[in-house]
Amino acid sequence: MSWFAIRVTYGRELKFKQLLNDAGFECFVPMRKKTVEKDGRKVILTVPAVANLCFVNSEKSLLDKFMRSFGDSCWGRYIWDKATRKPIIVPDKAMDDFIQISRVMSDDVLYLKEITSKLRQGQKVRVVKGPFKGVEGTVVRIKRSRRIVVELPGMLAIATTYVQPQDLELM
């Protein structure tokens, strides 16, 4: 089983995730909290953090069969690796770390769509304490604070909130 990145059309991430869950697939849509004003009151909503993105843990053949059952009207399509011309498969450890960071749903967690060489230059570390315990990534300074960046190859990266130096272990 592998984690596949799926591009979902027209903001239907949660509906597509529900369809997949009902069919027995393991899915993940990164979420964040958003404050909106409704009738003069502030309301906190939980919305997808990255537009049109869903991750599915499955055998490719089963996922293909599910998506083909909708014909051309399927809401999801694989995100392709341009170099290999195959669907992007996210490594299990990177996906586990991504999910762990995403579930914190803090305003300080950043989703980075552009992965620059600066993000790859930091030291490789493992978090040994706190809400991100077990996460492995690269230490990078973003917005004046030391954060751990976990990259999903070929797609995006996620940066944690500030992590204390004593909570880190060099790899």
Give the ranges of each region predicted by the language model.
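Short coil-to-beta-strand transition motifs
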Residues: V128-V135
